[in-house]
Amino acid sequence: MKKDTRYLVSVALMAAIVILLANTPLGMIQLPIIKATTVHIPVIIGAILLGPSAGAILGAIFGICSLISNTTAPTLLSFAFSPFLSTTGLVGVVKAIWISVGCRIMIGVISGWLWILFRKLKANSYLSLIITGFVGSMVNTIFVMGSIYLLFAGQYAAAKDVARTAVFGLIMGTVT
């Protein structure tokens, strides 16, 4: 598909917003265990305005910024977001890249395709925006926290000094 100059500039502007948010306390909110984020918001907006491919690009930029942030200013759970802090070798590197980049790409892809679906169904635009924004935020939360649970439950338990059986409850507590 041919992309015109306006599209490329729009993606670049949204990417600049993602990078700005990812490198300020407005986007990456430092908590004792993990970094909360608002960076997914421009990814969702970009996916709605520019489509799923732009959403994927913006999500990848968000993920790379997250990877860099967790490498340069680590928290207790940064091993789950940075391949350079992996505790389980090459497998841990791949898992960390999935959590930091892959999950964030999915925000843009799913939000973009959901918006396209709503447009094809001729759904109420206002309600569609609310639902797409909510789903995009939940994709971020569920994919990231779910992947941490599925891929790093043992390391999470060790980092928090709790039993592995308590990890699900702790992750759900972080989500809520």
Feature annotation, model-predicted:
Residues 1-176:
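Loop-helix junctions at membrane interfaces
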